Amino acid sequence: MIKIVGDGGLAREMRQLVQVVLGESCELLSPAAEAATTEWGKTVLGLGHANVRLAVYARLQGVADFQTIIHPGADVGDTTVIGHGSVITSGVVTTTDVVIGDGVLLNLNVTVGHDSVLGDCCVVNPGATISGGVRVGAGVLIGTGANIIEGLTIGDGAVVGAGSVVTKNVPPGITVVGIPAKAMLKP
């Protein structure tokens, strides 16, 4: 039985993916159930918040046996390197010499261009496009339908809002939104 950390919508999607790809049954773990779990075994992250995903991955590393899952409907380039515990869903396309870190989620219909590097536990939501040569830091959240043009760097812990078009580097910890994407002002 595979343990899925999380019990929301994404966790339920991960359960379906595990059943399709691995043919195994799953147990969804709420935060309380996760805290009470002492024996881990095979585990998949069902968490969509990149910062939470990064913290849980770090906490369970060496205890849980994180599974790397690639949907058969994904088109993963033969020179793409995929880290431990990453999940690649249906419709994802990676081209040549892409490096995907540990615990990464590439959700439905994401495209990642040549020579891009995605840091640990980043979450790339449905329909996002990452052009060639992009560096995405650890714990980055890229919103649904966002576009990042070639050669840019998205710093650790940054957030790219849904539908945004990123045309400049994004510093660590900053949230950007809009077309072109600009830093959100703090309240």
Please give the residue ranges for each predicted region:
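Structural signal for interior beta-strand "rungs" in well-ordered beta-sheet cores
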Residues: T68-M184
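Terminal amphipathic alpha-helical/low-complexity segments used for targeting or macromolecular assembly
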Residues: M1-P72, A181
